[in-house]
């Protein structure tokens, strides 16, 4: 959001267009879609929504200790559409939002059942509340913790950690690959399976009944590959620096998704204080790469970028 204001308010004064910078800063593959005809109007509308949600969140915190993590993991463009049309149907009509909410509810319900079934939380209401908060925090990459979920049973810690990579929507405050990219990848896989069974069938990749251009599909696949390669490189570098496999994997994922807590000594009950300078620099690089959506960082190392 900060770069959006910079592109709208500062660059025009310098005679430099801000549209490309805003496009680079906006998360998600559908960056060509504009909510309003002008970049300034789009930035203004998104900031009104952002500040409005922040103000409501402050009031809700004060009155009832509520949190808005799940709301902020949805696409802010959907908030804009719902606000403009005075209707909540915009959320239901969005495949990405439905998948995000469905994934959240399934994770929360499964986690709550596991905590209650294993006796970790004997009270059903406490199990549900703790699970709900943990899933909302990890899925939205907020990083808050009301319990040390790294010690929960049935592989729940790994599921929660991986949820930080896929549940948040594009155009939200969350990190990771984003749900829209995951939906496009699965749609592309379905397209390939259909082509194998019916070679002459015409089955375009679609999201919300709209055909996704091949340019965007290839961009999503490239992004997913580079994202996974960056995370794997981080894991290998951390392993080489002396970290344990569990902590290397969790710290790398937690950093590139901007989640924060990982597993083991870097879990919700721990911190990164004991790590060496080399390990902290590796994780800092992953945080920067993940926050700026990869290509924005990697293009700086391209020789063509610096050519006049």
Where are these regions (language model features)?
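Membrane-proximal intracellular helices of multi-pass ion channels
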Residues: 1-308
């Amino acid at each position: 959001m900060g770069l959006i204001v910079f592109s709208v308010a500062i660059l025009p004064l310098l005679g430099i267009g801000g549209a490309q910078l805003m496009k680079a800063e906006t998360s998600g593959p559908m960056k060509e879609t504009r909510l309003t005809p002008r970049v300034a109007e789009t930035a203004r509308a998104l900031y009104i929504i952002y500040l409005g949600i922040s103000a409501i969140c402050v009031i809700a915190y004060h009155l009832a200790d509520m949190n808005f993590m799940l709301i902020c993991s949805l696409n802010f463009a959907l908030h804009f559409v719902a606000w403009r049309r005075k209707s909540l149907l915009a959320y239901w009509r969005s495949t990405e939002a439905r998948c995000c909410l469905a994934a959240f509810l399934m994770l929360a319900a499964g986690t709550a059942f596991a905590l209650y079934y294993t006796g970790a939380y004997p009270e059903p209401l406490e199990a549900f509340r703790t699970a709900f908060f943990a899933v909302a925090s990890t899925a939205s990459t907020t990083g808050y913790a009301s319990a040390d979920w790294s010690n929960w049973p049935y592989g729940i810690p790994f599921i929660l950690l991986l949820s930080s990579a896929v549940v948040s929507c594009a155009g939200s405050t969350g990190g990771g690959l984003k749900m829209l990219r995951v939906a496009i990848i699965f749609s592309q896989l379905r397209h390939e399976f259909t082509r194998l069974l019916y070679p002459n069938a015409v089955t375009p990749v679609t999201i919300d009944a709209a055909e996704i251009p091949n340019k965007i599909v290839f961009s999503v696949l490239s992004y997913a590959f580079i994202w996974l390669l960056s995370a794997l490189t981080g894991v290998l570098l951390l392993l080489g620096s002396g970290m344990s496999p569990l902590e290397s994997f969790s710290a790398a994922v937690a950093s590139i998704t901007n989640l924060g807590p990982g597993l083991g000594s870097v879990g919700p009950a721990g911190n990164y204080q004991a790590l060496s300078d080399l390990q902290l620099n590796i994780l800092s690089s992953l945080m920067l790469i993940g926050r700026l959506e990869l290509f924005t960082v990697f293009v700086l190392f391209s020789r063509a970028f610096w050519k006049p």
